[in-house]
Amino acid sequence: MRSSSIRSLLWKETRQLGRNRTAMLTAAMLPFIILFLAPIQLLVALHFGGSPGIEELRNSPLPGFADVTDPSQLIVQFFYPMLLVMGGLLLPSLTTTYAIVAERERRSLELLISLPVSVAEILAAKLLAVLAVTALIGLPYVAIVLTLLLILGIAGAGTIPALLAPFLAAVACSICISLLLTLLARDFRTANNLSGAFVVPALLLTVGTLGAVGGPARTYVVAVILLALGALALVAALRWVSVERYLE
């Protein structure tokens, strides 16, 4: 693949995504709820003395909660990682549906194929554009929430990488899943069904790991699992599903 071709295509894809109101609205609203509004609501609940749900989960017999001694720990070590993973998984996959699958459905690929570029370069540029949109929209929400944790004294500086690790791993995993989704899906309906089939198991594994693994290392374990899932999706996309399938 040629980096010059990818850069040119990336600029074109980023501009095209910016003009797609449906894609941008979906990419903006869902992360706002998952990565910003829900964490802020948890902070408000904690400030006013917690909630019954938090207290019940803190007293759960699950081994992952054995070392949790107060609601703030529960929020930082369980709820926030879960929300960050959810946002990191959903944002790229939803953007991919509008950015890539919709183009196949509209039969507008012929214009791109007529250019002196390969299918691999087209896909690389599209996925990099999805990654750019994810960073542009998702990272500010995450940065605000993590800054509030530090300002309010709920978490220390060492907690920041522990929370960023599962989020970044979820984004990487979702990008790899998006590549596989791009090669398999033919229309919006198929893309949405496949997206749920890929993302839901990753979310269930995340929740199970957070509940089963104790201590601050739990988020890093989640990150490793998500990266492993992403690697499997990438291998499946490159080895068992031909990139040329994108043209079919």
Predicted regions and their residues:
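Aromatic- and glycine-rich beta-strand/loop motifs that create alpha-glucan
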Residues: 1-31
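Selective transmembrane-helix segments that form parts of the transport pathway or gating/packing helices
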Residues: 87, 92, 117-146
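Transmembrane helix boundary and interhelical loop/hinge segments in multi-pass membrane proteins
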Residues: 92-113, 127
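Extracellular/periplasmic helix-loop-helix junctions in multi-pass membrane proteins
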Residues: 184-192, 207-224
